[in-house]
Amino acid sequence: PWIPGWYGISNIDYYSSDELWLKSNLKANERFPGIWFMPGFWAEYGMCTEPSAFGSPMVFSEDSLPYAERIRTDISQADSLPRPEVRYDGMLPFVISRLRNNCDKIRQAGCEIRFAVSRGPFNIASFLRGTTELMVALAVDPERSHKFLNRITGFVCDWLSWQKECFKSIDGVLVLDDLIGFLGEDEFREYAIPVFRKIFMCTGAKVRFLHNDADGLITARSLKEMGVNMFNFSHNHSMREIRDLAGEEPESYVHGAAGH
């Protein structure tokens, strides 16, 4: 999300132009040669990407990040939530097309498409329903909340698997979900661990990368159960604090998000 402003173009130009998207990402790689960008050449449309597949209206502006408007305010509507077709619905085909159209030039620059990327089920659910409505439903209507999250989880698995099928160079998944940082211990164990375990196991990817830069202490204690071996956490937590909670297994790599 920082690339358009850094490169000196509007958000709309960045998201709508393959040429400007590629040039700005190549420039970032050239300007910071010692940095590994993960995922690198991220083709996405802000918070619109996954919710758009469910039919959420999308809002784009010149100076702010795209966002999706909610479509399900009542948890009783959980059973009617559609299962998107990831090859055709919303902005998802545009993500795949952008990467396909530019993959040769990306490789010519010495880079590769390595990650399948998706927002996580709680993040997507918060855009479909509203954050407050989602959190209240988790507390007062667990049966329907499980159904709602499970439907979204199935979609996330489909979406990650489709990306991996389209680009054989992919051997990592990145899932971004700050909403799990708002869950208490009991809610995290009941709702988050099972769905994230399913998501991180669904593609067989070697690198299983989770981003949560809200409160991450409960998350850090649960990384192994979730199937995570790389964790991007809030700059409000120290590396030592997260490492102590995550454990010392050599396959678990953790690093903090930069402050804003």
Task: Go through each PLM region and give its residues.
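A contiguous, low-structure linker/loop signature
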Residues: E44-P84
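Active-site loop segments of alpha/beta catalytic cores
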Residues: P1-Y14, P82-H260
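Bulky hydrophobic/aromatic packing residues
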Residues: F32-W36, I75, V156, D178-L179
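N-terminal basic, low-complexity leaders that serve as flexible interaction/assembly modules and, when applicable
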Residues: P1-F60, K147, I193, R197-K198, ...
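Generic hydrophobic, aliphatic-rich segments that mediate packing or membrane embedding
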Residues: W21-N25, Y67, Q77, M91-R98, ...
